Amino acid sequence: MSVMNGREVARESRDAQVFEFGTAPGSAVVKIPVQGGPIGGIAISRDGSLLVVTNNGTDTVSVVGTDTCRVTQTVTSVNEPFAIAMGNAEANRAYVSTVSSAYDAIAVIDVATNTVLGTHPLALSVSDLTLSPDDKYLYVSRNGTRGADVAVLDTTTGALIDVVDVSQAPGTTTQCVRMSPDGSVLYVGANGPSGGLLVVITTRAQSDGGRIGSRSRSRQKSSKPRGNQAAAGLRVVATIDIGSSVRDVALSPDGAIAYVASCGSDFGAVVDVIDTRTHQITSSRAISEIGGLVTRVSVSGDADRAYLVSEDRVTVLCTRTHDVIGTIRTGQPSCVVESPDGKYLYIADYSGTITRTAVASTIVSGTEQLALQRRGSMQWFSPELQQYAPALA
């Protein structure tokens, strides 16, 4: 056991079984050359038929058909695309963050027609974005000299309708933003002078038929409603100290658990498990297998696995036992996404390639997991602790 910020941190069991990439029984690996340079972001359509990736180096967004594992469309002239979110209701709609010398912006892309439908300029520097479950609102985490915040765009009009400060502490920056499955809570990974933070924000009241009210900042003491719309704005309800620098955040499919991946010089890669109801860290897991930086984390659709992306591999963590149950070695992975049916894991990398591997080839069976848990030396603890008008704002 180790101690980190007053909390003991469990380290991995020496008995954990690790599968090397492509060597597990029944493994099936397909390489998809996108050939657009380093891939910064990846998303998959709700039906699993399309992958959409951002190619920062070539100013393009590529669409890949998962049935053929081939690039079917390439959207050009998208300035330095990075973060991406796919529509839930609008299956062919993608929202992509872009960068230019004048401003960052959100590009709205129809991936079926290879068309940029609109571009919405924003003040400050965009770090990440996420959509509400009904696709009505886009939440964008931003950084600037005045601090870090989350901006809200109406996806129908492109208008900026709300901003909430994540922190007014100098030097604080947002890293990522995630939304609960029911759309009621935002989770923002941030880093400040004293370390990593998970900031919990409730979304606007939707008492007026799902519409949200006039623009306001949470730091203002009052705001006037427009018409009969709800006046309540986004509100920070909790800030959870993580310690090491936050790299990414992922939520379980039911929203009950948040997994925060962080990295520091003292403990390396760490995953904090947080109860989203109580806002308490229930356990912390230092993963010594990851020697370099952990950069991304995502959770499988059945909530059984967490995928941790690092410099030369994807590490698979059992969310029930918190044991490492698989390792997928591949060159310089950047991001991952699991297919909606849970059969495949798509791993994008900095060489411009997507690797598809069968999920069954990366994990051990449930029986093996139980055996590992019985043999392992793990100990756990409860810590004390269309073109629209610019939306610049």
Curated annotation (Swiss-Prot):
Q: Which residues form a coiled coil?
A: none
Q: Which InterPro entries match?
A: Haem_d1_sf, Host-pathogen_enzymatic-act, WD40/YVTN_repeat-like_dom_sf
Keywords on record:
Stress response, Virulence
Question: Could you tell me which residues belong to the region Disordered?
Answer: 208-230
Summarize the record's disruption phenotype note.
Deletion of the gene does not affect the synthesis of the major virulence factor ESAT-6, but greatly reduces its secretion. In infected macrophages, Rv1057 deletion significantly reduces the secretion levels of cytokines IL-1 beta, IL-10, TNF-alpha, and INF-gamma, but does not affect IL-4 and IL-8 levels. Deletion of Rv1057 greatly impairs the ability of M.tuberculosis to replicate in macrophages.
- Induction profile: Expression increases during early growth in macrophages. Expression is directly regulated by both the MprAB and TrcRS two-component systems. Negatively regulated by TrcS/TrcR. Activated by MprA/MprB under envelope stress. Expression may also be regulated by sigma E.
Presence of the UniProt keyword Aminoacyl-tRNA synthetase in the record = no
Q: Does the keyword NAD apply?
A: no
Q: Where is the composition biased (Basic residues)?
A: 214-224
Free-text function comment from the UniProt entry: May play an important role in host-pathogen interactions and in ESAT-6 secretion.
PANTHER family xref list: DIHYDRO-HEME D1 DEHYDROGENASE (PTHR47197:SF3), PROTEIN NIRF (PTHR47197)
Q: What is this protein called?
A: Seven-bladed beta-propeller protein Rv1057
Q: Which organism is it from?
A: Mycobacterium tuberculosis (strain ATCC 25618 / H37Rv)
